Amino acid sequence: IKSKCNGFTVSLSGGADSSCTVILVYEMIRRAMLELGEKEVIKKLNLKNLQEDNCSINTVMKNILITVYQKSKNSSLDTELSAKKLAQFISSTHFKWSINEEVKSIIDKISKTTNKKYNWKNDNIALQNVQARVRSPFIWFIANTNNMILLSTSNRSESAVGYSTMDGDTSGSVSPIAGIDKVFIKKLDNFYV
């Protein structure tokens, strides 16, 4: 509310962390609507385009949360469907696109410059990380052009062991699950999904 932003943006991978992040946004709005009432939530969130009478949580969520599934050739159908189902359940505005072209472009440019062919056997971490990092400019663009806060999706367990990807799942302005461990995240996800 104090940020004067229009809501939140999340790169929704269909995994536990991004799912937990959007569930927390949903739960925050659900509880606010129960506690304050629809009219007060609409007023506090400055949702002038919404009718105050009979405004559902689905309508509010569609206006304050954008989720994006950014698939690569290594993404599974399971994660894509999971992201889609969760986005439908919480009523976020949801988009999907492929990052294959951008990943290929980066790898090709570096291969050409270094005269080296990169492969999954020898360069697994670098190839995984380039996929995570190439998603960042796209989701930042969506956040910036909609005056929204980008929520990062890195959890405490990953940070503790150095598993999070800088400029990948750590990319964002606020990290709602940074202090939550993976075990709790999975329990919370199982409760909702």
Which residues are covered by each model-predicted region?
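ATP-dependent adenylation/nucleotidyltransferase module used to activate substrates
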Residues: 2-157, 189
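Mid-to-C-terminal catalytic subdomains of enzymes
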Residues: 148-193
